[in-house]
């Protein structure tokens, strides 16, 4: 139904009247609505849903259940770095539940008043992010993608370390399997995107991936990276364990299949597991996929994309 709506206002009206997103979108005026406003509300709803489950997590395993906070903090730090480099000031438009806000490693609101890289480093000097940021020369223009890559690597390292610290046996194995699969699917999608749109060198592609978490054989990853183009990437994937069986379609289509694989894996674990950490991780994945799907629909309608294309994103 949603993909066949004609305007963003119609999408919001449907979500308000027919779904559990009514409360999240209650303050949006359907006659004067823009995509960014909806995305902010959907992101807030995601964190609220996760926070509801976090409240019941064992105190001893709290580090694991709060892994989403690291992602929030990294996004805010990156936003601040970009604004400082562009010499622009703006207010952050992210609202997270009070329960989560109390668990952050720094006061999010205070970031707004920071006016220099020096002040930012000083402010974050007691956090896990300092060891990454202190290595960057902010006296010259920096590579935003490289900085984000370093912080994202820190994010994954922290989750892996936390899982190994708090869980053992099959629970640890299953949690790592879900995480590594998620990272690998992102790697695969990124390789395809580079081949389809940017024609980057093999070294450039390799440096943008988190290969330390790959579950595909090393030879397969090397062949994907060195593929002559998107068609060869798809051909190689059709012989892998993921078995995409895709013909030559645009990137949104491969991303759709990557999300489908992650969705089915998460759904299976949630259905058959009685392990609280597994249920929480899979729940957060399923919620994120649902939120992202809604964002894709809004974006597709905003740019007047065909229904068939929206449905394959």
Task: State where each predicted segment sits.
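N-terminal domain-start signal
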Residues: 1-313
